[in-house]
Amino acid sequence: MTEHLPMPQFGPLAGVRVVFSGIEIAGPFAGQMFAEWGAEVIWIENVAWADTIRVQPHYPQLSRRNLHALSLNIFKEEGRDAFLKLMETTDIFIEASKGPAFARRGITDEVLWEHNPKLVIAHLSGFGQYGDPQYTNLPAYNTIAQAFSGYLIQNGDKDQPMPAFPYTADYFSGMTATTSALAALYKVQQTGKGESIDIAMYEVMLRMGQYFMMDYFNGGEICPRMTKGKDPYYAGCGLYRCQDGYIVMEVVGITQIEEIFKDIGLAHLLGTPEVPKGTQLIHRINCPHGQLFEDKLDEWLANQPITAVLKRLSELNIASAKVLTIPELEGNPQYVARESITQWKTMSGETCKGPNIMPKFKNNPGKIWRGMPAHGMDTNAILKNIGYSDEQIRELVDKGLAKIVE
């Protein structure tokens, strides 16, 4: 059995080998999650051109930490042979490309399973591996998936739809690749038979936008978009402005509505036909007093600082939070207590700061053990790990099929 590459053993996925081929965010985000949970993750990059994410000044140090960097042309014959040899010792392979791009270039699921019948293969693309030919081969990024899925049209303000930001479809799709690959791996361990997963980014976002779509599919009702960050249906829910910034709150519950009505001068409406006893939500449209409730809330909040508002809402057991700015995050006591922001060393020895590993495993925690590797940094070690000699590696490099760091 091939030994794993040198790395600390930690996390719930220690001993699992994951290989991914993909650039930017969606596919690599799946690899990032696996790597932070203890899997040995090998990142395949183009020999001539590194992953375009490397041009960003700081983000790659987060998104590519804990990885092993392999620079290999997997579509040329000798490079393809090395790739297939690597697949023999791989548990999960993730590729992100335009539709069935790998199959078109001869790397089908069946070819991969010839080399490893237990392999879990996750294909991540904008429109899926099959379907209408006018879509399946199209490139897709975050906004494309949001627009095509019905997700984008639900977001923004009543005057204009806006994409959810930053890069929501990429992260949702990457996490879908992570979870579905783990589900498949669990089944493989029971049956010994590999699995192929077809992840279409637009279908991921279709599912993420499902809540109000059901009203249309089953009743023909189109949900309006938010107005200045407020829930399109329920008053007292959403984004509100105070004297010194913004909060969000959710006025939900019998007691909560009764008490907030008293605070803002609407106690006389309680128990009326419009706001009967036991009301748990105030419908912005159906309740005749929905707009009055909103106006009174705006007036009440605008004349108070955030600290006073949050204190009172807490007393009323109304869920609420200040809208934190990025500079406020790392000094927040909850962030400090849970070490939500952390630091690690880059490969050049510099300190990098960013989000910590999530979620927090109690018995087998994740770990940050290395920064982003250089382009081709681990090619030599990976090829030796699967049985290549120094001479064979040099031949691949001389032919432009692999890149190593001397």
From Swiss-Prot:
Q: What keywords sit in the KW lines?
A: Cytoplasm, Transferase
As recorded in UniProt, its EC number(s) are 2.8.3.21
Superkingdom of source:
Bacteria
Q: Which residues form the active site?
A: 170
GO MF, one annotated term: L-carnitine CoA-transferase activity
Any GO BP annotation: carnitine metabolic process
Disulfide topology: none
Q: Where does CoA bind?
A: 98, 105
**Which GO cellular component terms, listed alphabetically, does the Swiss-Prot or TrEMBL entry include?**
cytoplasm
Gene3D superfamilies xref list: Crotonobetainyl-coa:carnitine coa-transferase, domain 1, formyl-coa transferase, domain 3
InterPro entries, per database record:
CoA-transferase_III, CoA-Trfase_CaiB, CoA-Trfase_fam_III, CoA-Trfase_III_dom3_sf, CoA-Trfase_III_dom_1_sf
Keyword rRNA-binding assigned to the entry: answer is: no
In what pathway does it function? Amine and polyamine metabolism; carnitine metabolism
UniProt record similarity statement: Belongs to the CoA-transferase III family. CaiB subfamily.
Please give the HAMAP family that the UniProt record associates with this protein: CaiB (MF_01050)
State the protein's purpose.
Catalyzes the reversible transfer of the CoA moiety from gamma-butyrobetainyl-CoA to L-carnitine to generate L-carnitinyl-CoA and gamma-butyrobetaine. Is also able to catalyze the reversible transfer of the CoA moiety from gamma-butyrobetainyl-CoA or L-carnitinyl-CoA to crotonobetaine to generate crotonobetainyl-CoA.
Q: What is this protein called?
A: L-carnitine CoA-transferase
Which organism is this entry from?
A: Proteus mirabilis (strain HI4320)
- The encoding gene is caiB
